[in-house]
Amino acid sequence: GQPIQECVKNLAGKLPCTITCADNGDWHLGNGRSVLAAKPYVDGPFHVLMADHLFDPEILNIVRKEPLPDHGARLAVDLRLQNPHVDIDDVTKVHTKGDKIVDIGKGITGFNAFDTGVFWCTPGLFTAIEDSIESAGDDSLSGGVRILAAAELMGCCDIGDRTWIDVDTPALLTLAQEAMVERATVAV
């Protein structure tokens, strides 16, 4: 809505990047629809970031380090399956093989990583989400990732010991606030 757009406009003036708000009239549907709302504004590589995730900014550099596959994307993943900041019942799980994603979803088995919510993408992600909607009725971002994974166009990279938190509960909000204070203290 308007208050969020004003906040983003204010923030954009303080950052060395361009931020464009894309209105998603289908916000109540799958999160892939929010990605598709940005399609008219994108003609090159772009990030998809989860708004409720706090993450070490270095993860952006990690995910951009290698060239993107043509028409593909890359997801920063956490291989630390014992990460205490992860809500195992809610996290999106990832099955990787080398630097490729094989499968993704909240309910998959055989996973060996967690989705951090930090993506580096080509416009091929838009096509993959559209294909997922058309072929499977799945309008989630994960549906698009599965389409790219099936075509071996969905890469991944490990974040190592970098911090990320999906802020979905009051306890995780407290943890995120503590992490921000700690980071600010270290920066000073």
Task: Identify the function of each model-found stretch.
Residues 1-47, 186:
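Conserved N-terminal catalytic core of the sugar/cofactor nucleotidyltransferase
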Residues 3-7, 31, 58-59, 128, ...:
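Phosphate- and divalent-cation-binding pockets in alpha/beta enzyme and binding domains
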Residues 6, 56-135:
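Conserved core of the sugar-phosphate nucleotidyltransferase
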Residues 18-20, 100, 153-155:
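Conserved beta-strand segments of alpha/beta enzyme cores
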Residues 26-30, 81-83, 163-165:
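A short acidic, often aromatic-flanked loop/helix-cap motif at beta-alpha or helix-coil junctions
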Residues 44-45, 71, 152:
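Short coil/turn segments at beta-strand junctions that form active-site/ligand-binding loops
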Residues 49-51:
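Active-site acidic Asp-centered loop
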Residues 97, 110-188:
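Conserved alpha/beta core of the MobA/IspD/sugar-nucleotide pyrophosphorylase nucleotidyltransferase superfamily
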